[in-house]
């Protein structure tokens, strides 16, 4: 008879939380900087307020205990979710209280979405445009109306109840944030239990989340949208619960519902093909993806993620161990391979965050490129303002996330990287090859820059000399993007070959016929030519320069030939101390700062390209005589010179925002003006020296002393790093708001 030792018995139930670790205490709220010994003493100079902002969320500097840092981050995530739910609730509330949603639902091709009405204080009611259907309000471009229709929302009452649900969820999130920091805080081992986390996130969030959405779409969205598409008045459509509990009602729309679950259990799944389709392309009634296709997609995704959520080994001895996977990952030329990466990713949340930001940023950019080619919601494709806004929004979000990845990778290198644990693994080998990588990348940037820009300069010169036959264009020296055209054609032909079950290709942008809704183009084949080939290489150039700056910042964050002990100076420092000239702007932080400007360049050119290309070659009206595009196909003729971009895009299309005064678009004119000012204001911070301001401040303080009104808190010029941070923030804010007002005034006027 064997008696198992007592410790094995006790291990069955793991206690992975600490009870009541931190008392709830509101007194800290009244003490700014309570987390830092220096800051909590209060301000002696104006630098205090800047340091307070810089360090308030930098949990690493407040404690070195990884468990405490993890708990703070975890708790802060719940707070973030609470804020998101409040924002969402506000959106739904505006839809319920201040919008023309019910009118839009009856005629989405003529009535424009609006969910905000400006109060008449001193003439502001000029901003309320006539959006159709007798409604005066601001035209919105967020895409919520289209999303709500796809969800099967048919009344403002439903929006009200959802808004209340959002507030309930927000309250639950705020409570959870408090509870899991003050009452039951997870232990470090819980945060480091990656297999359980993967299983729960994959199976729970992504698997069950997709399954729940697929279920909602099948039982609520599909029947309601089918009736809406057929022209049934929203007030006549049965309520969601009637479809849920009345199979006969569903069977009238989708006959397979009469058979119940029998086909599912007998594996005769083809019976369900009336609501799980594989049509491809767009619904000609709404200009959006077939909702039966998107249901099929979410059901398939749910199955994949539910399987994926059972792959990792936890309490039962089956499944993969992430540490084993990583350590087995060795190639013939990669030394120790991924050995040591498991330890990095379970002890450095900056490393983890850097990877997640890079992937999520890339995903956001992929989303923006899919949403115009395959508009997921009904009547989204013909709402040009919303299409342009969604593309621009997801591009910006992606750009910021990718720069954030560079930032947190740099912080990881400075604060968390331990060379002794990373001998000859992939990270160590990348660091040892960094000179070869950066110099090659630098060569690529120079090559792309000179060649892509050189094509434009050549064309501008030939154009100025009156020699169009010597220009690179579709009518003279052609540089056709043959590979892109081949990819387009391959996708267009896919239903016959690689996707035999699909009835059409994924998007009309590959080729085929124009999809028009209410006389407006939803999507049509996008022809690519010399002008696209040229701007594509400008995209390649700006993206490679952004990567060069960010990657150099990460790879040289700890040391360089110039400053071998850089790691000791920290993540951000202005220069390597007195007596070492030429060592300024070398910190990892400064690389993020510089990377932001090139990210701005990259994204600007992408959204300008998109805006002009769509107006020239896709968006427009359809009549018996064919398609009439907004700018009449001028992209191919004009976008191959710099002068063409300046004259026929920026200048020609800014007339709407410049002449918006006195119309409902006048707010965009004011934003355009104000944002230019904010942008120009940034240059004062970016081009000036700290000493200049310190001298000025001291003369102003002298004047105050003369008048005996000297302040108790001593004024100080911004530090070099603070000045740069303020500068780049205003540069980006000004640039983004300028672009936003320029785009919207233009597209709302002509689209």
Curated annotation (Swiss-Prot):
Membrane topology (UniProt): Multi-pass membrane protein
One Gene Ontology cellular component annotation held by this UniProt entry: chloroplast thylakoid membrane
Domain of life of the source: Eukaryota
PROSITE patterns in alphabetical order: PHOTOSYSTEM_I_PSAAB (PS00419)
Disulfide bonds: none
Top-level class of the enzyme under EC nomenclature: oxidoreductase
Keywords tagged on the record: 4Fe-4S, Chlorophyll, Chloroplast, Chromophore, Electron transport, Iron, Iron-sulfur, Magnesium, Membrane, Metal-binding, Oxidoreductase, Photosynthesis, Photosystem I, Plastid, Thylakoid, Transmembrane, Transmembrane helix, Transport
Binding-site residues for [4Fe-4S] cluster, renumbered to this chain: 575, 584
Reactions this protein catalyses: reduced [plastocyanin] + hnu + oxidized [2Fe-2S]-[ferredoxin] = oxidized [plastocyanin] + reduced [2Fe-2S]-[ferredoxin]
InterPro entries: PSI_PsaA, PSI_PsaA/B, PSI_PsaA/B_CS, PSI_PsaA/B_sf
Compartments where found: Plastid, Chloroplast thylakoid membrane
Residues annotated to bind phylloquinone: 693
Annotated chlorophyll a' binding sites: 676
Assembly with partners or alone: The PsaA/B heterodimer binds the P700 chlorophyll special pair and subsequent electron acceptors. PSI consists of a core antenna complex that captures photons, and an electron transfer chain that converts photonic excitation into a charge separation. The eukaryotic PSI reaction center is composed of at least 11 subunits.
NCBIfam families: psaA
Function comment: PsaA and PsaB bind P700, the primary electron donor of photosystem I (PSI), as well as the electron acceptors A0, A1 and FX. PSI is a plastocyanin/cytochrome c6-ferredoxin oxidoreductase, converting photonic excitation into a charge separation, which transfers an electron from the donor P700 chlorophyll pair to the spectroscopically characterized acceptors A0, A1, FX, FA and FB in turn. Oxidized P700 is reduced on the lumenal side of the thylakoid membrane by plastocyanin or cytochrome c6.
Family: Belongs to the PsaA/PsaB family.
Name of the molecule in the record: Photosystem I P700 chlorophyll a apoprotein A1
Protein species of origin: Chlorella vulgaris (Green alga)
Underlying gene: psaA
């Amino acid at each position: 008879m064997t008696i198992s030792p007592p410790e094995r018995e006790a291990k069955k139930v793991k206690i992975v939380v600490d009870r009541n670790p931190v008392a709830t205490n509101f007194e800290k709220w009244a003490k700014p900087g309570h987390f830092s010994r220096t800051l909590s003493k209060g301000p002696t100079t104006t630098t205090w307020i800047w340091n307070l902002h810089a360090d308030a969320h930098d949990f690493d500097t407040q404690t070195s205990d990884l468990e405490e840092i993890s708990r703070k981050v975890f708790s802060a995530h719940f707070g973030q979710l609470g804020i998101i739910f409040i924002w969402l609730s506000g959106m739904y509330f505006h839809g319920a209280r201040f919008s023309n949603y019910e009118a839009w639902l009856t005629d989405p091709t003529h009535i424009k979405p609006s969910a905000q009405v400006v109060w008449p204080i001193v003439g502001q009611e000029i901003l309320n445009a006539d959006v159709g259907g007798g409604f005066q309000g601001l035209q919105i471009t967020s895409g919520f109306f289209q999303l709500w229709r796809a969800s099967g929302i048919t009344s403002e009452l439903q929006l009200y109840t959802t808004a209340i649900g959002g507030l309930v969820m927000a309250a639950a999130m705020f409570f959870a944030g408090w509870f899991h920091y003050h009452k039951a805080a997870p232990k470090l081992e819980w945060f480091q239990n990656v297999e359980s986390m993967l299983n729960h996130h994959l199976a729970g969030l992504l698997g069950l989340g997709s399954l729940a959405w697929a279920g909602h779409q099948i039982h609520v969205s599909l029947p309601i949208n089918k009736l809406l598409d057929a022209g049934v008045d929203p007030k006549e459509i049965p309520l969601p619960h009637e479809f849920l509990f009345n199979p006969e009602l569903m069977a009238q729309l989708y006959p397979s519902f009469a058979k119940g679950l029998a086909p599912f259990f007998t594996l005769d799944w083809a019976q369900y093909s009336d609501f799980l389709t594989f049509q491809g392309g767009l619904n000609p009634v709404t200009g959006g993806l077939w909702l039966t296709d998107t249901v099929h997609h979410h059901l398939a995704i749910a199955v994949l993620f539910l399987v994926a959520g059972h792959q990792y080994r936890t309490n039962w001895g089956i499944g993969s161990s992430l540490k084993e996977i990583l350590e087995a990952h060795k190639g013939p030329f990669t030394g120790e391979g991924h050995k040591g990466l498991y330890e990095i990713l379970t002890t450095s949340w900056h490393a983890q965050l850097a990877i997640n930001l890079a992937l999520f940023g890339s995903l956001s950019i992929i989303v923006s490129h899919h949403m115009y080619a395959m508009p997921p919601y009904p009547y989204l494709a013909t709402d040009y303002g919303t299409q342009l806004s969604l593309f621009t929004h997801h591009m910006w979000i992606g750009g910021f996330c990718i720069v954030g990845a560079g930032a947190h990778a740099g912080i990881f290198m400075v604060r968390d990287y331990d060379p002794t644990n990373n001998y000859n693994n992939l990270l160590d080998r990348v660091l040892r090859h960094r000179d070869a990588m950066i110099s090659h990348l630098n060569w690529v940037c120079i090559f792309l820059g000179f060649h892509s820009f050189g094509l434009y300069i050549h064309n501008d010169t030939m154009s100025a000399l009156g020699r169009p036959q010597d220009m690179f264009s579709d009518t003279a020296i052609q540089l056709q993007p043959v590979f892109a055209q081949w990819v387009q054609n391959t996708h267009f032909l896919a239903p016959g070959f690689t996707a035999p079950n699909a009835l059409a290709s994924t998007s009309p942008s590959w080729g085929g016929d124009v999809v028009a809704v209410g006389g407006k183009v939803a999507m049509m084949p996008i022809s690519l030519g010399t002008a696209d080939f040229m701007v594509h290489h400008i995209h390649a150039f700006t993206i490679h320069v952004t990567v060069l700056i960010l990657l150099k910042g990460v790879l040289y964050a700890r040391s360089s030939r110039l400053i071998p002990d850089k790691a000791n100076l920290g993540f951000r420092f202005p220069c390597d101390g007195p007596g070492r000239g030429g060592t300024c702007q070398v910190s990892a932080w400064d690389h993020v700062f510089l990377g932001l400007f090139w990210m701005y360049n990259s994204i600007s050119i992408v959204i300008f390209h998109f805006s002009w290309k769509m107006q020239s070659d896709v968006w427009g009206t359809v009549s018996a005589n064919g398609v009439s595009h907004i700018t009449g196909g001028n992209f191919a003729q004009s976008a191959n010179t710099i002068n063409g971009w300046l004259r026929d895009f920026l200048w020609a299309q800014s007339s709407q925002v410049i002449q918006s005064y006195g119309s409902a678009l006048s707010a965009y004119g004011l934003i355009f003006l104000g944002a230019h000012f904010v942008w120009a204001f940034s240059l004062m911070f970016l081009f000036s020296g700290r000493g200049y301001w310190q001298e000025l401040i001291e003369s102003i303080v002298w004047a105050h002393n003369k008048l005996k009104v000297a302040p108790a808190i001593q004024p100080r010029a911004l530090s070099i790093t603070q000045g740069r941070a303020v500068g780049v923030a205003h540069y980006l804010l000004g640039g983004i708001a300028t672009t936003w007002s320029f785009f919207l005034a233009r597209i709302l006027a002509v689209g």
